C-alpha cells in the first residue's frame, strides 16, 4: 500500500498521516484534521484534493471527507498503526487489533450499500448530519415526497433507534412523508403502531 501510494504521489508521510486520521471515521471534518495532524488547513485541502483525484477520498458533506476505497480504509484503520505487531504476532493480530473494532468499521460500508440501493429508487439522495451526531439519508421521489432513511440499526432496529431519529427531526423542525429503515434482522413490531409509515428494507433484498 505504501509503495503504491508513493508511486502516485510525493510526500508519502503526509498522505499517510491524513489517511490514518480519516480511517477511524471520527476525524473527517477539516477542522478535526487540522487539530489532529497539526498541518495547516490549506495544506490539508491540497492533499485532500489530490486524494480525491486518486479516488481514495470523497467529500460526503460540506467540509467532511471519508476514505471511499474499502481496502485503503482497512489498511489505514487496522494495519498501518500496528505495522510492527503485524509482523510479530501472527494470528493474534486479528484478536487484539481488529475483532472488537470491526463492527464499527463495517458500518460505513453498510451505509454505502444502502446508499446504492436508495440511488436506484429515488430522484435525489443526500446525507443529513444531524445535530445529535447521527448521519441519515434524505431522499426525494419524483412526486416531491420526502423520505428520511435510517441505516443505523444494522442488527435489529429498535424503538431506541427510532426515538433518536425522532429527536433529531424534532430538533431541526424536520418533517417527512415516510421513514425508511435499513436493518439486517428486522425491527421491533411496536414501531409500526405509530402514525408515520415505516418501511423496512434488508440489504439483501432485490426490490
Give the role of each language-model region:
Residues 26-29, 172-176:
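Short, surface-exposed connector motifs at secondary-structure boundaries
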Residues 109-170, 188-190, 207:
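Catalytic centers of nucleases
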Residues 79-82, 160-164, 194:
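Surface-exposed beta-strand edges and their flanking turn/coil or helix-capping segments
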Residues 83-84, 90-93, 172-175, 203-206:
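Glycine-rich loops and low-complexity Gly/Arg-rich segments
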Residues 1-133:
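Accessory nucleic acid-recognition modules appended to NTPase machines
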